[in-house]
Amino acid sequence: MNIKVGTAPDSWGVWFPENEKQTPWERCMNEMAESGYAGIELGPWGYLPNEYDSLKEELEKRNLELTATTLVGDLTSDRKTEELIALLDEMAVLQLRFDSAKYVVLIDDCYTDLFTGELVRPQFLNDAEWDKFITNILKIRDHAKA
């Protein structure tokens, strides 16, 4: 059996496209390769190079494959879901050029502020919010399949 293991920039503490406290993308990719990972997901849009030739070159230098792109947002919000769908379309232009990138990682937003810890969304969903959450996931899924 041949198993390949992948990782993501968030394993290196990367949550934002740009933040001076985060590991620089070059170091992140180097350490992923040095750790023996075979595949990576793109992480937050704009953190790794998002131009095909540049990303392809950086992946090949490190013998890594792109396996997925990532969407993060408030899945209980119709407005945020529409923004995620627009971002999915933008990312698809890049993703579809990599045969190995067959997945989209979908992550709901945190319910606390990542810098202050302040509660910014309900910690628990009520029935209506849960229904909206599922509806919006299915909406993104259906759009991705189209």
Features from the language model and the residues they span:
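N-terminal pre-domain/capping segments
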Residues: 1-100, 123-145
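Short glycine-enriched loops at secondary-structure junctions
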Residues: 59, 106-112
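A short hydrophobic beta-strand element
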Residues: 102-104
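Active-site-proximal beta-alpha loop/turn segments in soluble metabolic enzymes
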Residues: 110-126, 146
